[in-house]
Regions:
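Conserved P-loop NTPase "ATPase switch" module shared by AAA+ and STAND
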Residues: 62-93, 97, 101-109
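Walker A/P-loop nucleotide-binding motif
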Residues: 32-47
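Conserved AAA+ ATPase "sensor/coupling" helix adjacent to the nucleotide-binding pocket
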Residues: 120-121, 129, 140-155
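A short, basic N-terminal segment
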Residues: 1-29, 188-202
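Conserved AAA+ ATPase "SRH/arginine-finger" region at the nucleotide-binding site
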Residues: 112-114, 129-141
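Short conserved motifs of the RecA-like P-loop NTPase core
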Residues: 156-169
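The conserved phosphate-sensing helix
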Residues: 169-181
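Short regulatory helix/loop adjacent to the ATP-binding pocket of P-loop NTPases
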Residues: 110-127
Length: 202
């Protein structure tokens, strides 16, 4: 029986690319106060988990009220609580105590980095951070991403199939994610058979 591809399965493999090169280099150089931001499914959480594990860095997914951090920390939070006074105290704690902090977040959080969406004190603190963007994927990375998602369930299709899929999707990480899911469903619906004609019709 076909097992549907679980695209939310935990993944520890970082796909190194030109799109995330600046972010990776900034982490390797240990930029003291850093914000890494990027589109949905761009690998921010995977990078945060991998680097935190390899370098014994604390990783948190929330802004705690009790602040007892004593070493370099990663905050992985897709939506920053810009109107929360506690978030200001969180940022201030790291700056005052000279503790390195890297924030992984969404493009929207940075696009809206102004006094309309954030407390002025929060904006002031975040502007002390170095901004580093993970860019949308180009064709080569899209190909690798689709292949990677399929490999999670040991699904293999010809290069021609993936290349054809690339002609019909947007250049986003989420599109690669959804394309792999579509390929998996087409395989299921067509008794494990898939061809270029089927892709074009879909």
């Amino acid at each position: 029986m076909q097992t549907f591809l679980n695209l939310n399965s935990f993944d520890t493999e970082i796909l190194y690319s030109l799109e995330n090169d600046t972010a990776i280099q900034s982490l390797e150089k240990k930029v003291k106060y850093l914000i890494i931001y990027g589109p949905n499914k761009s690998g921010k959480t995977t990078i945060a988990k991998k680097f935190s594990t390899n370098n014994n860095i604390d990783l948190t997914n929330s802004v705690p009220h009790e602040l007892n951090f004593n070493k370099e920390t990663y905050l992985d939070l897709n939506t920053l609580p810009g109107q929360d006074e506690n978030f200001f105290h969180f940022l201030q704690y790291f700056v005052t105590n000279n503790i390195p902090l890297t924030i992984f977040t969404s493009e929207n959080s940075i696009d809206n980095l102004n006094d309309e969406f954030y407390l002025p004190d929060v904006v002031s603190r975040l502007k002390q951070f170095t901004l580093c963007n993970i860019h949308n994927p180009k064709k080569d990375l899209l190909f690798k991403l689709i292949n990677k998602y399929l490999s999670f369930k040991s699904i293999s299709v010809s290069e021609q199939i993936i290349i054809e899929v690339l002609n019909h999707i947007e250049r986003t990480y989420l599109s690669a994610f959804e394309a792999a899911n579509t390929i998996n469903h087409l395989l299921y619906e067509n008794n494990h058979n898939i061809n270029l004609s089927l892709i074009r019709k879909h």
